[in-house]
Amino acid sequence: MYRIGSSIKKSNQIRLATIRTTTNVVIRNYCSETSSTQPPPPEQGQETPKPIIKKKKQSREIFSEFVDDGDVVVDHRKHSQKKAVVDQRTQDFDKMLASLTMKDLKLMRYSDNPETFELFSREHFNINDAFEMNLTTKSLLQKQKEKEQKELPGSLFKTQKVIYDNYSQIKSDHIANELNKFKEEFEKPLVSAYNEVINQSNLLYRTKRAEERLIKKRIEKERKEYKLSGLEKHYRDIVQVRNALDFRGKTILAGSDEEDAWQRILERSEITDPHNLSRLHMMDEYNDLGYQTEITEDYINQLSIVPFDFANPASYSSMVNLIDQLVQVDTYRDPEEIASLLVAEKLRAIKKANDQGTEEGKKLSKLLQSQLILELKADRYLETYECTLPELPTPEEIKKFTIDELKELEIVRMAATRLEQYQEAKNRIHILEDNTKQDKIDNYKFYQQMNAPSVANSRDATNLLTVGEMSLKAGTRPSTEDEIIDLLPHDEEVREEHEDDLVDDEKVVATTNEEEPSQEVEESEPVPDIEDPFAINKDFFDKNGRFLLSDKIEAEEQEQEDLIKDDDVAIENVESLITEESVPIAVEESVTTVVEESVTKPPKFLERFAEKGKLPPIRNSNKDSVRQIAESLFNINFDYQEELDEIDGRMDAIDAFHENQEELPLDEREGELDEDIVRPLPSTLPDLKALSAKIRKNEEESLNMIANKYINQEVNEKTATEVLDQIYEAYKTNNLFDKDIIEHDKNTIREANGDVAIPESMYFEYDTTFSDLVDRDVIFKMPLKDTDLVRVLTHQLTETGLLKQEKVLKHNTDDMPVSKELVESNPDAFPDFVKEIIDQNPNDSTDMPITREYIETYDPLIKEFREKMSITKNKDGSVVEEVIEEELIKDENEEEEDEDEEDEGDNKQRVIERSDEVHDEIYDERRLYINLRPQIKDEGVISVPTSTKKITKPIEKDGIDNNDGWLMGKPFNMLNYRLNNQPNKLPMDNVQSEGERVPGEDEPDILVEELADEEDEEFKDLSPSFDQQPKIFEQTDLYYYLQQGKNQEWFRPEKISDKDITSLERRQTWYPRQHIKTYPFEFISSHNTTDQTIEDSWVNRKAVLKVNISAFNLSKTVQDRLAQLTANRYDPQKKVLTLVANNHKTLPENKYEVKRLFKELLHEASLADPNFVSVRTDNYKAPQPQSFVPSQAAKNQTRFNLYRLQGFPLLNNQQRQHMELYSHIRSHLDSTL
């Protein structure tokens, strides 16, 4: 039927097309005939007659070519005569219908869609494929593709069509093969060689380098925070540099101070680990070692700080002077340093005398030059002859000496004075040795015991065993009585015993000194005074102290000076002399000095004494030279291993003396005890004086380099920042991170605390004594507040010894008083909210509040009261305060009652008592302002004020799209929510109807009166009476409102107590909670914070959705299709589908994404159901109008006329109809003309 209807439709189209063509032919034929009636064209040689045109009919003749007859428009334009050729092609419709193929019939479906029509028109169909169900669009496209890839006919070459995707894959495979070849040839040998090279030592080295780079990166990262962005940061950096310099000056030279060593460790840890990432348990972001607190403390002194102007040299010198003042001056200097300073001073004096240009200055410079030469020659003489002198010649022998010999004699005399100084210092050292050797013995064994084997400080097992063997051989001795006394508190009796022991030790030392043979030089004659330079031999000097042979010496010197003409030679000779002496002298440039001849030969007059045997042999040995003697004098470093035998012998003598000596009573003991008993440093510590000198030298060099760099630059933010950064970096490299200082700190702490492991950085843990903080953190995972953090850290710092007890925060920072100026300048921030209740009597609510006007009225009474409060003294000397209450309580209206008088007197008395506090209306230093107190009392649990979030857009999504399945966040009716929109059949428990009374309770009227008396007027409307029906929200909100405001000042706790709350609790009715049907969903998500520096991790944004498919009542085909789509995500046994989404940044987005994915899967699976109708917009298509319209007879079903039986019209009949139509049109047109 369908094919027959299509063929009829096609035949009708053909018939209409033929009618349309015949009509056109008729019109063309008629136009050709009308044109033939016109006059013929003129022949050649004749003129064409001109048409006569009337001007009046010009406008009308323009359109005269067209004649409108109402129905037909006829064209009168002239056309060239053409013979119309009628196409008389014959079309046999029977033959056309018979020639229709199945392809034509099938293509009629796609006549409305040209793209599909074109696609299907390319293929050839068989009659057998008309009703083939397996034919799909995919198979047709595959056939079309194969057809396109066929070889062209007559082609000599094979056509290769390459798709881009295939070509890209080929290229990727080629690159992968090349990479594999490279790995086989080069990478594997390199990896094997790398694994052979890397061993344990290399790993340690790499680890150390990595740690250094990590420290540099962290320091660089922290340094960027100090870039200047304003004056405030500039001052902060200045404070930091000032504190760093001050800290360096006070602690580096402070000796074995344990607190300073701990402070340096803490500062190093703060620089290397500013965020305290090396802690164990304290994982909150507030633990920053109190850095912000230190910065705020430094701001107290920032107004007194003036930034240094590094472009000004005077400012740089002031900084150097500041460092010199901070450093403790060490007067106990090395003799070489003293000698070099003396020589430098004399050289400066010589230069100054030469610069004067006068004769006196020249004489003075010559005298100083001669003295300097004599002193240098005397030092050289002592070094050459091992600090021994021959016998001085007699005056008779001196008269025979030449001038050279006299000069040499003067050198020997000066050497004698220096030798006496050295001998005196040696005697002092010997006494010092006897007094301190016993203490050194005990300290040596104590340090030996302190450095016992320990796993903490041992590098490997062999080192541990060797140290253990040494400690076992050394042994340990029991604690003596003196050591036990040192550990006990020093009472007066203990101090006396200790004094007596000190006296006994001095006696033992004296006895041991007498027993030992003295190794000193025997003094046959009394030693002359060192201060008298001419006391050695007075025969050579006159009464005025002038040398007798000075004239000869001056003449000889004049001859030598004449030979010297160039000053440069003299300077070079002096420089060579100084280098020979190897004395570090700070010689300034352009300093003129004298010519010095190095002493390489012995004096001439000593040759005579050598013959007589009076001169000791010359030995150029360096054992007892002046330099080594000075080191033995000033740097006392005993070698305990070499002197162990001598020490043991002295210990035996001391023990024997203690055994033989009788113990004296306490009253007879004498002696003095130093209150500050300082323990000597351990032997492993470096020399503190040398270490301090090294640090100071490095600091001065770094400061000098920085000052020279910025000496002439403009002072702005950039230069100031660079200078501050460089100073701070130099401070860290020279002071904090110096290897010797780190080792010094560790040994200092070990000296004080024993053999302990010293941490590289400090970290803190929670203290279990703070039970409220531990409960709050462990149970509720809440971070510490700032006040709690200060409390915990100060407590821990005092326990570790890093803070003193008086520095601990004793008062809460929230309760700190505020300055009066701050309150007066900000009246809005500090409102006077307690003005009405601060002085009210809690028992009497009718008291008048104290205001400014009230105080001004009683101001004369206050002045009079102060006058009456004059302090007088009795005869006994006691102070008496005279207060006359009757004069103070003076009423203006004497006719008032006695009760009113008493009340007014009380008000006056309270005004007088608070006169010093309320004299200012705004400021009260004892008042706690509202922004300095917490809004809710913190008792260790979560207590957050209620806050309702406004919903900008109403949630109109379905339950599957709604992220808020439990309605947490939008308003709802509590009663309908709990009863699930069911009527409330349960009666109210404690609500009585009129006339009903519950036995055992008070009368309702009495109860209402009690409530009315206790409650305040402000809350009266919130408490319902018994005759009212309570609302569901009224009870809960009032209870929460009062519970949050309990014990708070602004909630008037004296007016509303717990009794009111309990009465409200009795009225509350709790309805049973019923089950609410929800979708069978289960979301699995994580809320753990993995790192404090990252806002959220990938685990937190991951959303897992588990769906119970059995709850959806799906058909078997849909379930199978869903299982086929989801593969292993679907569990066929439990019928649970698991979907995961983690592509989005937040958890709500991933939840929405996984729910959308489930909806898509459910829709796709439902398409397998043939009865499923999709209403989605992407799948819905509007129905197309039917192309076949049945006839009226077909609608009425009266008769059925098939087109094939009726037959098609013959060609003759059709031509006849056309001629009839043609004649009709022509006759109609002729009638109109």
Curated annotation (Swiss-Prot):
Region described as Disordered: 32-51, 510-529, 882-915
GO BP annotation list: mitochondrial translation
Protein name (Swiss-Prot/TrEMBL): Uncharacterized protein DDB_G0279527
Residue stretches of biased makeup (Basic and acidic residues): 906-915
Entry GO MF terms: structural constituent of ribosome
Lineage: Eukaryota, Amoebozoa, Evosea, Eumycetozoa, Dictyostelia
Species annotation: Dictyostelium discoideum
Ranges of Acidic residues composition bias in the record: 513-529, 882-905
InterPro entries according to UniProt: Ribosomal_mS35_mit, Ribosomal_mS35_mt
Gene Ontology, cellular component aspect: mitochondrial small ribosomal subunit
